[in-house]
């Protein structure tokens, strides 16, 4: 019997997957526990419509991320910090400070999306990658100035 899984079932199938399982397993376990529905033509059309809307939503997110990338790369992020001789900072500039500086400029970015290998410890310009979307990474320019 063909069924469409409505939830992940370990070892059998993932949510939204169309699969052939034994009649008894489907009627006595999967369908009563709402883990799957019978694969009728109506249910298959619903599944296809859901997948289409998911694709459209993912495409819209990707476009939004690309637009955000353009905006972030155009911004100049300036962070004041106390520095000693030779441009070495007292302390360091972390992802949290970069996220706050972006927030002040109207761009809300989660600090976990800022991919800084190690905190910035010197004055000057630094290129910082920001992962906006799994497929889109913006490279922002952070300028650390002496306070």
UniProtKB/Swiss-Prot annotation:
The keyword Ribosomal protein applies. It holds the Pfam family Ribosomal_L9_N. SUPFAM superfamilies: L9 N-domain-like (SSF55658), Ribosomal protein L9 C-domain (SSF55653). The keyword Isomerase does not apply. Transmembrane segments: none annotated. GO terms for cellular component: ribonucleoprotein complex; ribosome. GO terms for molecular function: rRNA binding; structural constituent of ribosome. GO terms for biological process: translation. Keywords: Ribonucleoprotein, Ribosomal protein, RNA-binding, rRNA-binding. InterPro entries: Ribosomal_bL9, Ribosomal_bL9/RNase_H1_N, Ribosomal_bL9_bac/chp, Ribosomal_bL9_C, Ribosomal_bL9_C_sf, Ribosomal_bL9_N, Ribosomal_bL9_N_sf. PANTHER family: 50S RIBOSOMAL PROTEIN L9. HAMAP family: Ribosomal_bL9 (MF_00503). Binds to the 23S rRNA. Belongs to the bacterial ribosomal protein bL9 family. This is Large ribosomal subunit protein bL9. It comes from Shouchella clausii (strain KSM-K16) (Alkalihalobacillus clausii). The gene is rplI.
């Amino acid at each position: 019997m063909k069924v469409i899984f409505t939830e992940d079932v370990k070892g059998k199938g993932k949510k939204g997957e169309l699969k052939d399982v034994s009649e008894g397993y489907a009627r006595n376990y999967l369908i009563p526990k709402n883990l799957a529905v019978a694969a009728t033509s109506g249910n298959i059309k619903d599944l296809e419509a859901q997948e289409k809307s998911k694709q459209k939503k993912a495409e819209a997110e990707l476009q939004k991320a690309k637009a955000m990338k353009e905006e972030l790369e155009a911004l100049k992020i300036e962070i004041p910090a106390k520095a000693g001789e030779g441009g070495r900072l007292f302390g360091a500039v972390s992802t949290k400070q970069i996220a706050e500086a972006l927030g002040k400029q109207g761009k809300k970015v989660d600090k976990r999306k800022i991919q800084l290998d190690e905190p910035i410890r010197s004055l000057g310009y630094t290129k910082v990658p920001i992962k906006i979307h799994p497929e889109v990474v913006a490279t922002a320019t952070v300028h650390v100035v002496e306070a």
